């Protein structure tokens, strides 16, 4: 039986980030809606054609989104929060963007969080009791029609109904969100009927929550949902990011026609798994890693798939997950070292890998895949990869270096005496707005168009401006603004040995936000200080403390494309040792507050709780290692993004940061409930306003949020700060927002003084 191939999705941003640029032009009023729609249409055509030319048999349709695919599903279901509704009973792109971004002056955006354990984000669906859901957004049908008209062999993609419900949150009056499953299923049935009328072979229906440890009522919901959806069109139940072996007993009873499994990130005995599922099911094997950039060992996969390919079952081969998480095309990289470039495979090359592998399997000819796999061996013996001096230092790391000199209670007394901050001390998270001219300066400096002297002069001028603004606003703890940094991970990668960098390796994080992850190609070490010059200069401009700003070891690891030949723990420990040296150098230069950001800490958790302990153990260890050399009077801060903290509070506390800042504003301080329950002992900056929205927070809204925070955290341990860095905001928004933040804080301080007098 012929083995066909498919991808689970393709990057949507465009090779030159065309979607990002068009979105931002539309939001700023520089682009008409018809022009934005045209950009989307052209990108879809290019993506479909590129996959077809690369040898993909089934072209995925439904992977394109104007912000994220979960929000697209909310639009399809008519699940629009009332505050975002149009004045007339209709929905449109502006409605979608309001949900994602909010609307000035005071319509808040919906919450945003991480997509499973990736650095991609989605807008969290909001579920309200008695909300009427109805089919409202026909994007999937329109795009299927587009692709069919172009002659493609189409495979529509839908986010599965159970996963959609799992990812959302009940708002307002509580009810069981599974109560609305029936209404959702009616809409899915309508969409599937429409798709069945379009002569497609099957629908890819994504249910990644099947890799989790599900409560019984959610398993029961699967039985109900897929019984209702059966018989309309063929369904390929699609899972990724981990194994579903633990759930196979109920999955195999679902009335679907096939299953996709992630063989890269899930542990499977393929022969055994194949024997457990119905013989008539298609089996789609995710063998090409959709989350990393390394060239695939096609010989390994050839042997594995051959072992079951004569079992008279229809087999598909595909990417492990959507290729959304990888850069688009390696051919666009003109400056990568030739040796290193041969080690990589981006989205287009992964399509070619699928073509090579399916051809080899069908023709029983391995010559082409042998040739493809040669660079994998070359890399294993390259001197760029393993370095004896790094290995030697690693072997001498002792566990007692993973802690501060004294416990927090002792340190806090010494720090309070040293800094004498007022109650509710104010600070920011690190970055300040980056103008077009600053981005151009960095680019020109890299290209050699600007001298180091000119570059340094302009960066220092920017630092001086940032310090002056913060002093005028009367912020207590300052930052230098990070004008020299393109990205909080890439910057450190550029100053560490063991990394490679792309010119165009962009990956979508959320909406128009794209990141360009560095690639960890070998052992990591710090050849020289990375941040000292800028922090030292900033501190020389003010008597107020200026924070040294570092990205933590887990975040550098997880927001890079990591090696696959050594453990993540080993890579993280190498990074921690480099940061340990940097922290001590900052302290020597009288930088007495040092922030080590770990926004990715929770993202790295294995998807199943039973596997959490090992990861959290080393993740905590490497953070503590990086901060372990400083004096009691040196204050260590950390920052975390979009986290559900409830089930990892033990580990958060074990980090032993003197101050943790988090993103609780967008959740209306709900995230602090876990800090209260745990009786978190250290200081907390919960985030006084949401920086991801262009709304200027009012003084009263900030006071309201801080009053809520005081219900969870003792007043003396609360810091006041924006909920994230300010790089993506403009200067006017930033100054007005910070002005209101400081004013709100001063009002509360006066109120506290008055209450003390009373």
Curated annotation (Swiss-Prot):
Signal sequence, start to end = none
For this protein, the record's Gene3D superfamilies field holds:
3.20.20.210
Annotated L-methionine binding lies at 429-431, 482, 597
Residues where Zn(2+) binds:
639, 641, 663, 724
Pfam families from the UniProt entry? Meth_synt_1, Meth_synt_2
Specify which residues bind L-homocysteine according to the UniProt entry for this protein: 429-431, 482, 597
Q: Which CDD domains match?
A: CIMS_C_terminal_like, CIMS_N_terminal_like
Annotated positions binding 5-methyltetrahydropteroyltri-L-glutamate: 17-20, 114, 513-514, 559, 603
Q: Which reaction does it catalyse?
A: 5-methyltetrahydropteroyltri-L-glutamate + L-homocysteine = tetrahydropteroyltri-L-glutamate + L-methionine
Give the GO biological process terms: methionine biosynthetic process; methylation
Active site, UniProt feature: 692 (proton donor)
Q: Name one GO molecular function term.
A: 5-methyltetrahydropteroyltriglutamate-homocysteine S-methyltransferase activity
InterPro entries, alphabetized = Cbl-indep_Met_Synth_N, Cobalamin-indep_Met_synthase, Met_Synth_C/arc, UROD/MetE-like_sf
List its EC numbers.
2.1.1.14
Q: Pathway listed for it?
A: Amino-acid biosynthesis; L-methionine biosynthesis via de novo pathway; L-methionine from L-homocysteine (MetE route): step 1/1
Q: How is the cofactor bound?
A: Binds 1 zinc ion per subunit.
Sorted UniProt keywords:
Amino-acid biosynthesis, Metal-binding, Methionine biosynthesis, Methyltransferase, Repeat, Transferase, Zinc
Family of this protein: Belongs to the vitamin-B12 independent methionine synthase family.
Its biological purpose: Catalyzes the transfer of a methyl group from 5-methyltetrahydrofolate to homocysteine resulting in methionine formation.
Looking up PANTHER family in the UniProt record yields: 5-METHYLTETRAHYDROPTEROYLTRIGLUTAMATE--HOMOCYSTEINE METHYLTRANSFERASE
Its name, as the record gives it, is 5-methyltetrahydropteroyltriglutamate--homocysteine methyltransferase
Organism annotation: Buchnera aphidicola subsp. Acyrthosiphon pisum (strain APS) (Acyrthosiphon pisum symbiotic bacterium)
Q: What is the lineage of its organism?
A: Bacteria, Pseudomonadati, Pseudomonadota, Gammaproteobacteria, Enterobacterales
